[in-house]
Each structure stands twice: as structure tokens, then as C-alpha cells.
Amino acid sequence: DQDCLPGWSFYEGHCYKVFDVKKTWEDAEKFCTEQMSGGHLVSFHSSEEVDFMIKLASPILKFDLVWIGLSNFWRDCHWGWSDGVKLDYKAWSDKPNCYVAKTVDPQWLHRDCSRTYKFVCKSRVPR
């Protein structure tokens, strides 16, 4: 839809895909960058975008947790999205290293970056 690759879903100028495979945060982020130019773990910039991800992920993953691009993985104590977009919308519960989002409600939880979770990739629509 809207020029996304087959299997990807369009929302507000970006393409999204849920991956039903577990990886560490770093491996999931690397995987997303390899899927599509400009790809990263999903970042959120509105509650509507979170709702879109929940609608996309919950039928595939049921109740689960997915890695999102929020971390301080590369920036000591500086929080930011892995796609470089500034942190303008927050829904977190606490504050350590990497974050997962629930697939059933708009809540983010911190988890050790070395744990493995399923994930959602996001990319700009390819030109």
C-alpha cells in the first residue's frame, strides 16, 4: 500500500513490518537497517502512531512485547530514537537501557538490551 514493499504496511509516509522472530535490541536494529533504506526499529511520534502499531502487531503476535527504537544504547545517558528523530512523544514507565512496547496497550517498558524480543521495523516510503 502507498508504495511500501509487499508485506509492509503504510502509515503517515512510512512503511512498517512486524517480525515474528526474536533478536537482541542491537541485532533487531541492524536487521531493520538491512531490510530497507532508512529502516530502523519503530519510533513513535504520536499516540495515533502507537495505536497503528498495536493494530498491526497484535493480530500477528497476540499479547507480546516488541523492541522499539528507543534506547541509550549508543549515547551514554542521552535518550533518542535509533532513526535519529528527536524524542517528542513519550510513554515510558521507568528509565534504563532499551525499551519494548506492549502489543495490546500503549505502554513502554524497559528491558535489558541483551534480552531477545520480537520487533517492528519502520522506514520512510521508498522513492
UniProtKB/Swiss-Prot annotation:
Q: Does the keyword Magnesium apply?
A: no
Q: List the disulfide bonds.
A: 4-15, 32-121, 98-113
- Keyword Disulfide bond on entry: yes
Compartments it resides in: Secreted
Recorded GO CC terms: extracellular region
Q: Which UniProt keywords apply?
A: Disulfide bond, Hemostasis impairing toxin, Secreted, Toxin
For this entry, the protein name equals Snaclec macrovipecetin subunit beta
